[in-house]
Design a protein with these regions (language model features):
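Noncatalytic alpha-helical scaffold of FAD-dependent oxidoreductases
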Residues: 1-189
């Protein structure tokens, strides 16, 4: 699910839930079967240079999130798995929008039973701090497969924050919430 983690008040917690099913050829109409057989080439856009100052602030993130949310609507669509699993890969050099200051990618994993409370506390902390994230993605995770793998059964929330004053302190506060709920943060981001 895409989440708007800048919104507050009646818009707090709004999101777009994406669900998908694998399609068998026999399930498709002739038109969709032809589309599926075509080579998938996604149109890409690029941020060609590093922007010298951060354009990401509460106002710009709010405007983007409002537009993105309004564009989304309940619909059924047929799309290539690349577009479904990697929806932002059409933007090349996306990190340039964060200026030379850069960004912090923060990802947490919370046990399923603590998910609602922990995610709510994290979102409220981010909203209160004005930290806003241009990108926030919430996923439900299955059982942990490997002894050294990061994810375990529960929820993972990934957020990209522009580096600015107070961001390290906010991340430390998020760390405390995650630990209090039996979760973990992804240290290699």
């Amino acid at each position: 699910a895409w989440m708007d983690i800048v919104a507050s008040g009646s818009k707090y917690g709004r999101n777009i839930l994406l669900l998908g099913n694998h399609s068998e050829s026999a399930e498709l109409t002739d038109k969709l079967r032809k589309k599926a057989a075509e080579k998938y080439v996604e149109k890409k856009i690029s941020v060609p240079f590093e922007i010298p100052f951060t354009t990401l602030n509460k106002l710009s993130i709010t405007l983007f999130n409002n537009a993105y949310y309004m564009k989304a609507r309940s619909k059924t669509d047929f799309q290539h798995y690349d577009k479904y699993f990697y929806p932002l890969d059409f933007i090349l050099n996306w990190n340039h929008i964060y200026s030379k200051s850069g960004l912090i990618q923060y990802q947490l994993n919370i046990p399923e039973e603590a998910g609602k409370d922990a995610v709510d506390k994290v979102l409220k902390k981010v909203v209160a701090s004005g930290g806003g994230s241009f990108l926030a993605v919430l996923k439900k995770m299955g059982d942990q497969d490997g002894i050294l793998s990061f994810p375990f059964k529960g929820y993972t929330l990934s957020m990209d924050f522009p580096v600015k004053k107070g961001i390290i302190e906010m991340c430390k506060e998020l760390d405390a919430i995650v630990l209090d709920h039996g979760g973990r943060t992804y240290l290699t981001k």
